[in-house]
Amino acid sequence: MYKRLLIIALSLLFSGVAFAQEQQDPWIWPDDHIKDALFLRIGVGPRIGGGMAMATEPSFFDFDLKGNLAYQIGATLNFQMANHSSVKPHGIGHWGLEIEALYGSRNYKSGDETMAMRCLEIPILLQFYITQGFLLEAGLTTVKLLNVSPGYLQTGGVVAYVGGIKGNDVMFSAGLCYKTSFGLDFGFRYNYGLSEWAENFHSKSSAAMVSVSYLFSLIK
């Protein structure tokens, strides 16, 4: 199932890239533009994503936790920095920074029950542009758990109080993205949880997500 998710995610990403490549290249500078200059782009806009949430099996329990759907919606603030030269007009070592505020829900299956964890996510990611539009990104995502439903999880005669799962997590996030010239971005990201759900519930979260965002330029 996870392989199918990955195939679908990559198909969506490259479909967006194929469409975007028909547009004008945003990194081509006119001949009369001043080169050898450091510049900064700032963009802000909405972001929406979906994918698969996964969790490791907790120690001392056999809940047979399985992955299920996850989604997130929110806003993103993006900074792009580059140093252009007359030798390489497309730029040398493009760097960027992305800060997001997302409301998300991660769902997990255990037998006939579905557990939903709703949370606030704050990713802070360093970005490196490997071409004019393609970039790699990596960083940390701070997660604040808002609520869990249902409060109890039961399977095989074992009942666990999951409403007491702690409210904070830190996830390592890495992915790739394609930015178009007209503001639409397509991305794939993997998040791996570094914290356990609770002292007596040793399970960690992860998620594979595809997303679409649209950036309005504040500074070009």
Predicted segments — roles?
Residues 21-85, 193, 215-220:
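Short glycine/proline- and aromatic-enriched beta-strand/turn motifs that initiate or cap beta-hairpins
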Residues 16-20:
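Sec/Tat signal peptide C-region and signal peptidase I cleavage site
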Residues 174, 178-184, 204-220:
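Outer-membrane beta-barrel "beta-signal"
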Residues 84-87, 95, 134-136, 182-188, ...:
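Repeated loop/turn-to-beta-strand initiation elements of outer-membrane beta-barrel proteins
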Residues 74-78, 123-125, 175-177, 211-213:
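Outer-membrane beta-barrel architecture
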Residues 46-52, 99-103, 138-142, 188-192, ...:
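Transmembrane beta-barrel strands of outer-membrane/channel proteins
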